[in-house]
Design a protein with these regions (language model features):
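Structured cytosolic domains appended to multi-pass membrane proteins
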Residues: 1-64
């Protein structure tokens, strides 16, 4: 839904402004498709979407 996407985009924008990378884990196919269509995946960076929490945590460690 549009309001959810707006809220997510604002959240990520605040995080980026503060030097924080937001990493998404285990996003299901349908919500991911909505995020992709909205341009949110490109905004966040496709590499910040991980298939599971272990991958997300391992990726986060590489950013530290």
């Amino acid at each position: 839904d549009a309001s959810a996407m707006k809220s997510l985009r604002e959240f990520v924008a605040r995080a980026k402004k503060n030097g924080i990378t937001v990493i998404f884990s285990h996003v299901n196919e349908q919500p991911y498709a909505v995020m992709e269509k909205d341009g949110f995946v490109e905004y966040v960076g496709e590499n910040n979407f991980r298939s599971n929490i272990v991958e997300a945590l391992e990726y986060a460690e590489t950013l530290a």
